[in-house]
């Protein structure tokens, strides 16, 4: 099971590295569509900042899967929290019928919403973040 968790952490890390990099380049305009208009920050700043956070978390997931294993749970919890914090962007895209990333119908945008909870769960499970949260709850 430890091998499967490590492989999934590596895959999630690679996914975040790729997504974060695309925030800064090829898909920047697409990501702008997800920034809620009620957010009191410059949308371009939000896209760049979230991209840098994704790159950082992706790298840390990979590093903690391979070598700094004692920090895996902490990085997993932080990644899960990040996924929760960016969820309003996905909701914004759905509610306001915004086309981006090929999500050009409400059905596609709704299906995309369904992927966020499993991403949160994956971040917690593959990093042993759930175990860390259980330990913290006992304190």
Q: Which positions does each model-derived feature cover?
A:
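Membrane-interface extramembranous regions
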Residues: 1-139
């Amino acid at each position: 099971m430890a091998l499967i968790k490590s492989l999934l952490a590596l895959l999630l890390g690679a996914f975040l590295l790729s997504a974060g990099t695309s925030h800064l380049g090829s898909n920047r305009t697409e990501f702008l569509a997800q920034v809620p208009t009620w957010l009191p920050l410059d949308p371009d700043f939000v896209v760049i900042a979230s991209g840098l956070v994704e790159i950082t978390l992706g790298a840390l997931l990979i590093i903690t899967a391979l070598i700094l294993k004692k920090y895996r749970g902490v990085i997993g919890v932080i990644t899960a929290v990040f996924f929760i914090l960016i969820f309003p962007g996905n909701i914004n895209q759905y509610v306001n019928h915004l086309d981006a990333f090929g999500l050009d119908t409400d059905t596609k945008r709704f299906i995309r919403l369904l992927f966020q909870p499993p991403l949160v769960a994956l971040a917690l499970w593959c990093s042993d973040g759930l175990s860390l949260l259980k330990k913290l709850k006992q304190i």
